[in-house]
């Protein structure tokens, strides 16, 4: 029984010491990986920020290039009376004489093309 204890005790001490060393190594590896991951995340974050800033600059340039006159003026929707001489129907609509309804109100309405 003593020989079993004598052989078991050094094996146990060796296993504990190696296990502790492995635990410390694992902890160090995890810290290194975490630091590498943080640096990678910082790099990715900076890259994404640069791309977003470039996109924002492009969008602001496009907005500043448009003038107020380039916007579509107010238009008349479908089925709304319009003036034959000055039709302000929205895009995709045409100022036409109605076929059935509206004959007695105004002579022209905005209809789809």
Swiss-Prot record:
The family database entries (InterPro entries) matched by this protein are listed as: Toxin_22
Subcellular location(s) per record = Secreted
Disulfide connectivity? 75-90, 82-95, 89-110
List the propeptide residues: 22-74
One of the record's GO cellular component terms: extracellular region
Pfam families tied to this protein: Toxin_22
Which family does the similarity line name?
Answer: Belongs to the neurotoxin 14 (magi-1) family. 01 (HNTX-16) subfamily.
Q: What is this protein called?
A: U11-theraphotoxin-Hhn1a
Protein species of origin: Cyriopagopus hainanus
């Amino acid at each position: 029984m003593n020989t079993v204890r004598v052989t078991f005790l050094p094996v146990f001490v060796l296993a504990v010491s190696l296990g502790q060393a492995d635990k410390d190594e694992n902890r160090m590896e995890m810290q290194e990986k975490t630091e590498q991951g943080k640096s990678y995340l910082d790099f990715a974050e900076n890259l994404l920020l640069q791309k977003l800033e470039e996109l924002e600059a492009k969008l602001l340039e496009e907005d500043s290039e448009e003038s107020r006159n380039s916007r579509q003026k107010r238009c008349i929707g479908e089925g709304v009376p319009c003036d034959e001489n000055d039709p302000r129907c929205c895009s995709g609509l045409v100022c036409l004489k109605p076929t059935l309804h509206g004959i007695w109100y105004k002579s022209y309405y905005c209809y789809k093309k």
